[in-house]
Amino acid sequence: MLFLGFSSGLPLLLIFATLSLWLREAGVDRAEVTYFSWAALAYSFKFVWAPLIDKLPVPLLASRLGQRRGWLLLAQVAVVGAIVLMAQSDPGTAAGLQWMVVAAVMLGFSSATQDIVIDAYRIEAVEKELQAMMASTYVAGYRLGMLMAGAVALYLAAGFGTTKEVYVYEAWKWTYF
């Protein structure tokens, strides 16, 4: 459960905190940064598609892995794909900024979906007596993921050569990889 918590905490700060700094260093206009608020909507409205995830099986995966694990695998592949797309998108260019918006929205949606599945899986995986331990282990992993996406990511970006004064796309690219 620690690793599932980590995989939930990591995307949150990659979208909201670390990305804002990256965009500012790339010289993205504040008006254009507002497009990235679409990524946050997925977290706010995940209750809308949560019942679908409970009811609909993922073709091919559900029969092999089960309902929850099938959705979890699909969501995690989408999270990784979105992070890779973000790493490949230079927001310092117009086309790169558009792809960055797409990747951030994709990351928000897939991460919110992953949160839905992990919460359901955590509740169903163990007996009631172990729920508190599972929840605390999940939260510890979540916090570690947030730490990695926040402070560690900024440390890496600086280590790869980007600063407030000098924008280095390659530094951010390797940080997100």
PLM features: what roles do these ranges have?
Residues A42-W49, A132-A158:
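Glycine-rich segments within core transmembrane alpha-helices of 12-TM secondary carriers
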Residues E32-P59, V79-V80:
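Central cavity-lining transmembrane alpha-helices of secondary-active solute carriers
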Residues V58-P59, G70-A94:
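C-terminal ends and interior cores of transmembrane alpha-helices
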